[in-house]
Every structure is written in C-alpha cells, then in structure tokens.
Amino acid sequence: LLITSAAFIYAYSDNPYFTITKKDVSVKFPAYFPKPVYAFENNKPTPAGFVLGRMLFYDPILSRDSSTSCASCHQRFAAFAHIDHALSHGINGLIGKRNVPAIQNMIWQSSFMWDGAVNHLEQQPLAPITNPVEMDNELITLMNKLQVISQWFTYLL
C-alpha cells in the first residue's frame, strides 16, 4: 500500500499535476522535476487506493488500541511533520526517540526514517505500525481487525 503517499496526494487532489477520476489516476510532473524513485508501474495509483490511503492515514485503527493514527504525528498543517513536541508521542503517551520527519515528496526519496533504515516506500508504514513506542501493532492482528470492519473490506480485496 502507498498509505502515506496516497494520503498526501489525495489531500492535495486539487493540484493540477494530479488528476483523479472514477476510473483512473494520472500523475504528471513538470519537465524540470527529477524522475521519481518510486516505480508506479509496480503499484499503479487508483482512486480506491487514494481513498484507502486517506482513510488509513487518519484512522487510529492502525494502532494496537485504536488511539493513534498516522495523522496524530504527521500533521497536515505542518507539512505532515510534527511541530507540537520535540519528540513524538505514541501509544499510551509513550515518548519516541526523535520527532517525525515530514512526509512530503516521498516518491523522490530512496530511504526513509531519520537513519535511512527503510529503503522502500511501500515498507515504510510498517515501521511505525509495528514499533512498540509508536503504534504497537502486529500486522496479522491489524489485518484481522481490518477485515472485521465492513468499511475496510471493500478496499482490502
């Protein structure tokens, strides 16, 4: 899933470089932009994917106790960074080791996290979801949780 990038692009869907229709998503970049690192042909953007990304980004269901969403730390008004605290706050009020990076222009990045520990955009969301200080969830538990809720089932097929 392109959770973070889909949420970001969907949030700015009125941008003339992104066109979303019922059947298609087209992404056009100005000629002077560098080529994206992310390979869209391996996971083509779809309208349903953008909706799913936005829903997942803002819904706290991704955290173990459904208290913390991606947007809890990646605040839209702050370029999807976190400016309210020096260190990020996660599940149960736990304090992280660093602040969250902004999540803009991610399709041009080859590594993620402050230390570059993740090197693929599709793998990046797994780090905070499974981190015990951030969202503290297990992927199998999360998938089971999402499949029970009918609003998610349509997008997960």
Regions found by a protein language model. Name each.
Residues 4-157:
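Periplasmic c-type cytochrome electron-transfer domains
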